[in-house]
């Protein structure tokens, strides 16, 4: 059991999604405290995420077969629904990020202004006045339009507030990111099946769950331990990494979601 869960934890620790989260957190002010809070958030969500299914599997053996049917490939088509859905979602997020980067790049390009504005005649001016009058009437919002405008304004204020908190390095943002690192059901089922099928006492199985989670987050522990032992040297390594990840934050997200989406899509379609 121990060799199986440690080997699996080492493989999961190299997950590009987890590495991308680290780079994303490092792109914020106060990277080390944000890493600590992110690590705590991961523990908060992963400990019950692995323990509760383990207790359920021990209490209801028939539930293990039901959970396995939900996460395994279809015998006829070879399609794995969970992985396929995850891949489609990740690719959709990657496409949205790429579109936003393209729109921002287009908006930053200089706009050439023509020189024909001074050649307008009286007819053009009259037409402009008529069009302006009609445009003013069309711009008068109704009740539904005013409600939509208020909702959009409130949403813009919320997004602006969240962006401000992100730029200021608020620790609760890192905690939310840590809580969002939820273990995927196939991984939970695999780990709990290995641990539960070992026949070890319940106390040993609980310890095995904690060992797996700590090994899965080994990148965080190594970074934090290095900072405690040699803060200056660790900071010297973190600062250039922090600056690089801050400059390429959007690209990191794009590559991260794209790579995860393609991999999950390939697995979900049964290619591998």
Curated annotation (Swiss-Prot):
Signal peptide: none annotated. Disulfide bonds: none annotated. Pfam families: SfLAP (PF11139). One of its GO terms (cellular component) is plasma membrane. It is a multi-pass membrane protein. One of its GO terms (biological process) is lipid transport. It comes from the Bacteria. The chain crosses the membrane at residues 5-25, 36-56, 79-99, 171-191, 206-226, 252-272. Keywords: Cell inner membrane, Cell membrane, Lipid transport, Membrane, Transmembrane, Transmembrane helix, Transport. InterPro entries: Gap/Sap. It is found in: Cell inner membrane. Disruption phenotype: Deletion mutant synthesizes GPL at a level similar to the wild-type strain, but is unable to transport it to the cell surface. GPLs are retained within the cytoplasmic compartment. Mutant is not able to slide. Belongs to the peptidoglycolipid addressing protein (GAP) (TC 2.A.116) family. Required for the transport of peptidoglycolipids (GPLs) to the cell surface. This is Peptidoglycolipid exporter Gap. The lineage of its organism: Bacteria, Bacillati, Actinomycetota, Actinomycetes, Mycobacteriales.
